[in-house]
Amino acid sequence: MAKIKLYLYVSTLITASFVFAEASWEPLFNGKDLSGWRATDPSKFKVEDGLLIGFQNDGKGADLRTVDEFDHFELKFRYKRTEKGNSGIWFRQFYQFDLLDMMPVTLSGAFYYPKCPTTFVWKNVDESLEKTNEWNEGQIYANGNRIIFWLNGQMLGDETLDPKVHRISKSGSIGVQVHGGDAFKGMQVTFQKIDIRSLNPGDPPSMPVVVVGE
């Protein structure tokens, strides 16, 4: 009987650990309103027909950020943007998955990081990866200092940030940026979904880790 009880106890622990490790995806945007979010300028964000929309027509930008903060996670989002739009997904305070066309410098999928020496940890110059004014799928893996981005299933970069080179942020809110500037007047970025999945330290990414061109 003691052996059976021990077996059941160990099995329960293993099952519980597996369930915890395989945390389910949870929506950050509920498709109805901006509950759980706060904006620096609420006039630049709205929910319409189940979609989260960020826009500016006056040259002034704004951020919309979650009330909650996150450390180890995967984030996936479905979005489309206008051609001259400049936006991005903030995470861990000042890391950003860029959503823009700023050629010849970079395109959507760049890892914008103003606290690093080069401003970008990596860039994207492949124009075929994003569809302007159509739905696109972005995904972020942030576990410890390791960051990976995907755009429409293609991996854009996989970097373990070096504290000797980069200013490291361990956690922070998730945010949507509407970039300021007259050049971006009339811009709009639209999100159909923004989902998050908590990770344990060291959990592997759910997407393939293969760099474009390999």
Q: What do the predicted segments below correspond to?
A:
Residues 21-214:
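Carbohydrate-interacting regions of secretory-pathway proteins
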Residues 1-10:
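Bacterial N-terminal signal peptides that target proteins for export
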Residues 9-17:
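Bacterial N-terminal signal peptides
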